[in-house]
Amino acid sequence: MGEAEKFHYIYSCDLDINVQLKIGSLEGKREQKSYKAVLEDPMLKFSGLYQETCSDLYVTCQVFAEGKPLALPVRTSYKAFSTRWNWNEWLKLPVKYPDLPRNAQVALTIWDVYGPGKAVPVGGTTVSLFGKYGMFRQGMHDLKVWPNVEADGSEPTKTPGRTSSTLSEDQMSRLAKLTKAHRQGHMVKVDWLDRLTFREIEMINESEKRSSNFMYLMVEFRCVKCDDKEYGIVYYEKDGDESSPILTGFEIVKVPDPQMSMENLVESKHHKLARSLRSGPSDHGLKPNAATRDQLNIIVSYPPTKQLTYEEQDLVWKFRYYLTNQEKALTKFLKCVNWDLPQEAKQALELLGKWKPMDVEDSLELLSSHYANPTVRRYAVARLRQADDEDLLMYLLQLVQALKYENFDDIKNGLEPTKKESQGSVSESVSNSGIGSAEIDSSQIITSPLPPVSSPPPASKTKESSDGESLEQDLCTFLISRACKNSTLANYLYWYVIVECEGQDTQQRDPKTHEMYLNVMRRFSQALLKGDKSVRVMRSLLAAQQTFVDRLVHLMKAVQRESGNRKKKNERLQALLGDNEKMNLSDVELIPLPLEPQVKIRGIIPETATLFKSALMPAQLFFKTEDGGKYPVIFKHGDDLRQDQLILQIISLMDKLLRKENLDLKLTPYKVLATSTKHGFMQFIQSVPVAEVLDTEGSIQNFFRKYAPSENGPNGISAEVMDTYVKSCAGYCVITYILGVGDRHLDNLLLTKTGKLFHIDFGYILGRDPKPLPPPMKLNKEMVEGMGGTQSEQYQEFRKQCYTAFLHLRRYSNLILNLFSLMVDANIPDIALEPDKTVKKVQDKFRLDLSDEEAVHYMQSLIDESVHALFAAVVEQIHKFAQYWRK
């Protein structure tokens, strides 16, 4: 290989000198401004643009990489020009070759003087320092100048100096490449011919520049020579060829922090100073300004699950006296208190008595696990005393669960000492039983023998009366005292507590809680024994109910053990019900029905009892009522009804809240009562599954026309029935959406002849669903066609009712969230999966972050999404085929 064919190069990282750049000449004509521009800016007349000779231009040069400057700009020295701009000056840039990144580029801006101390850009151009193969540029380059702008150092640049957008520029670029190849020795050098060729190239370039509308700046990059050999500068990083390990995944680095989980002394000191007794008098008359008042109102409107920041807590504490006239602010104030500091707790409790009394429904929050202070909890109980029995009944299920957060020792200390002469003594009956079963223990508490019915001693009566009226009642004492005054409350309190007493999972997981509920039942039994004649009769009726349910469970077990098909089991069921000697269920003394104690029953009608087609075969039973009527129920054995019981209680509460707002959505909150974790009662409503309606009648409207025809009504249907159907659809769509009810299909949507649509089977709640991609609410094409289609007046009324119901329920969101917060430890299947997320799931459905107008638009989108859900329709057909093959 000849010397001329060798390529000599040096790495950029080894060339430890500054980059140099020569500014040559500027070719082309500057375009003068229009007369309009001169009139608008008279200073233009005195700028270099209007000089007779060439104006005194100068050039600035700056290196950029990735749009960021690498060094300060440098500029050419002053030079006076006459006929052409020619600086012919080398600029030493304040950056060295090893410091240049691969994508470095130099931005050149030409400036003209424009008045005192001011300059304007004549144009700018940008060129990369390294070529596409990593070679540092060398030799002369003509760069296209973009007029009236500064050079752009971003990547990609808006002012590229090397471009080939026109034919003339293509010619210049081709000649520049040939010149470069000649310089690098890729062509045979002939001196006389080279001189002629270079002269011709210069003439062509000059001609092309003059014919174009752009200006061109000629620059020269320095060549590196050593021993008369020209070296190319190749971009290279030091140690760049060394391999380095690359992590394919994330690696957790544990850094020990000796102060982790320790007290922050600064925050603690600030907290103590802010809450000290010295600040009390100064805070007493403190009133917020408008901005602070708005901030306090926002804090007060937070949902109960919202955690206050330290700044918000300090703000509420600072204006605590101002907030005492706002009942909604009390729970937020109590969240700010550090109950471990005695002085702070003392101040809070003193202020508690001066605070404007809070609403009954808001006091439920103070009974949750977040409030352990006994005085605060007793304050909540005192507020509950203002609720009537009907309202108390709506919260009773949650109040029984709230007993888990009470002081267990206080509940136990409330027990009366055992007396030998008291045949109804709970402790004696339990201790003598010798049976470890929780179910038998709890039932024995209420079914133990009664002493003769007579008036109790005056002293006992006085004590009970004083206890009942005491403002210092704990929750257990309050519930028992109210139950002793109302037989309906007593009925449900007994069954709610009895389920907690017999829960085997609770007994094994948390024996202290199990023992607490046994003590509650013992105290309840003692209170009933100490009451007057009517109260003691109440106890005997509860005992009779327990005996009746035990016999019914025994009967269902016998039927389930019976071999054969459903017909044989039906015959066995009716035979056992008719056998009064063995079961004694068809003719009993008058007792309240546990499911609905206002209804008095005399027994079960054997001939009408049937078993449903189901794996567990629940029984449909007709009870003989006191007035000779029939009361149909479903008794399920082998199924936990506590989840259905909770959902139906919430639906019943929502129905009451909506009626309070004069909105009757024709809901059907049928009654459910779990008498154990394995069995319970459900009210039977005469109705037909929507799937069966579609199979037999073809459509929902045909079903209504059959049972409620009307010539004047919409589509030949009674207007009242259609109105009921539309409202019940709207109510259940909104409610099931809020509660996240899943597994919705046309077999668990029932329809009555009066137009009421309602849901059953709440095995999946809070967003759980066995089907993939469920719609937000169950609203399919057949249901909409039952209203007359999406263009009908009834469908528009349905949407309006949905919006109204959603807005009303959002206003009661705190009450609903408080009820769910008391159920997080209730061991209900879908709540037990993620108890810490239960309340958040319900809160998210309310979309409390939206205004009322935004909430209406949100509900509109949910309805539209549900109506047009294609995948839900496919799943419905799959379910229909599955049901067909099962039959």
Swiss-Prot record:
Cellular compartments annotated: Midbody; Late endosome; Cytoplasmic vesicle, Autophagosome
PIK helical domain sequence ranges: 282-520
Residue ranges with Pro residues bias: 449-459
Residue ranges of every copy of the C2 PI3K-type domain listed in the record: 35-184
Domain PI3K/PI4K catalytic positions: 605-871
EC number: 2.7.1.137
GO biological process, one term: phosphatidylinositol-mediated signaling
Modified residues (Phosphothreonine): 163
Region (Activation loop): 759-780
Gene Ontology cellular component annotations, sorted alphabetically: autophagosome; cytoplasm; endosome; late endosome; membrane; midbody; peroxisome; phagophore assembly site
Ranges where the record places region Catalytic loop: 740-748
Region entry G-loop, spans: 611-617
Top-level taxon: Eukaryota
Compositional bias ranges of the Low complexity kind: 423-435
Keywords carried by this UniProt record: ATP-binding, Autophagy, Cell cycle, Cell division, Cytoplasmic vesicle, Endosome, Kinase, Lipid metabolism, Manganese, Nucleotide-binding, Phosphoprotein, Transferase, Ubl conjugation
Annotated Polar residues bias: 156-170
Chain intervals for the UniProt region annotation (Disordered): 150-170, 416-435, 446-468
Family: Belongs to the PI3/PI4-kinase family.
Subunit note: Component of the PI3K (PI3KC3/PI3K-III/class III phosphatidylinositol 3-kinase) complex the core of which is composed of the catalytic subunit PIK3C3, the regulatory subunit PIK3R4 and BECN1 associating with additional regulatory/auxiliary subunits to form alternative complex forms. Alternative complex forms containing a fourth regulatory subunit in a mutually exclusive manner are: the PI3K complex I (PI3KC3-C1) containing ATG14, and the PI3K complex II (PI3KC3-C2) containing UVRAG.
Function, in words: Catalytic subunit of the PI3K complex that mediates formation of phosphatidylinositol 3-phosphate; different complex forms are believed to play a role in multiple membrane trafficking pathways: PI3KC3-C1 is involved in initiation of autophagosomes and PI3KC3-C2 in maturation of autophagosomes and endocytosis. As part of PI3KC3-C1, promotes endoplasmic reticulum membrane curvature formation prior to vesicle budding. Involved in regulation of degradative endocytic trafficking and required for the abscission step in cytokinesis, probably in the context of PI3KC3-C2.
Name of the protein in its database record: Phosphatidylinositol 3-kinase catalytic subunit type 3
Organism: Sus scrofa (Pig)
